[in-house]
Amino acid sequence: MEPAAIIAPQRARGEGRLVAKAEGGRTRIAELYQEGCAKIRLPKTFDASMEAVLINSSGGVTGGDRLSWEFRAGKGTKLTLTTQACEKVYKAAAGTAEIATRISVAAGAHVDWLPQETILFDRSALSRSLEVDLAADASFLAVEAVLIGRKAMGEEVRAGLFRDNWRIRSGGRLIHAENLALAGDIAALASRRAVLDGAAAFATLVYAAPDCESQLSKLRLALAGHALSGVSHYDVGGRDKIVARVAAADGFALRKILIPLISHLRKDASVPKVWTL
């Protein structure tokens, strides 16, 4: 009698890479690579910048899925990176989903990292990382938002795992690092005053640019009426950065806070159009 075959569960794999260069007064493609469920689309822009929309064609991630993204903004380029939709993290039968993102920004270049929200479902498991290398005079804006279930759908995350690790360097020197870990009954953790005080949506904003200090008062004014939010300015070895933490009751309320902040730091440019489709 032959042993029964063991069929491994199907898992999503994806790898995407985009390299941008400055040519003819515009930001253009130098290299584009996509494999598996990772897709990159480049909508038409009407200025010198480039916008890239990232797509996970598997429709979400679950235990054992692996996605890898790499972006390199060449000297003098301006690149906006966003996602087609919210990244949904579904119940994991086994294993942990992994998403790794690497971004390098050359001299005089600017990158906006503006993915739409990550939605955690009950019994989901995700570990993700963001590695950013900036030239000494490059600038960078990053916003990552997370929803702990969808409040309008009555969802709660009573068991799960979410790890989020950031490392941002400027001129080879570490200027920002954070390790977030939510494990177990995430809804109960979020209800604690020292964590989210009952909020089900939260975001981190990091801005590294020469004009950080001049932006601080306007950002504080924008957040003045939001008790669960705050913004600070830091000088790390001569490199300025702004860090804002925002929390809200749900995803809709979170967007109402975030969009004006993002627009202001993008010099009054709107958020990527896919955010409003």
Swiss-Prot record:
GO MF assignments: nickel cation binding
Transmembrane segments: none
Keywords: Chaperone, Cytoplasm, Nickel insertion
Subcellular location per the Swiss-Prot or TrEMBL entry: Cytoplasm
Described function: Required for maturation of urease via the functional incorporation of the urease nickel metallocenter.
Oligomeric and partner information: UreD, UreF and UreG form a complex that acts as a GTP-hydrolysis-dependent molecular chaperone, activating the urease apoprotein by helping to assemble the nickel containing metallocenter of UreC. The UreE protein probably delivers the nickel.
Family from the record: Belongs to the UreD family.
Protein's recorded name: Urease accessory protein UreD
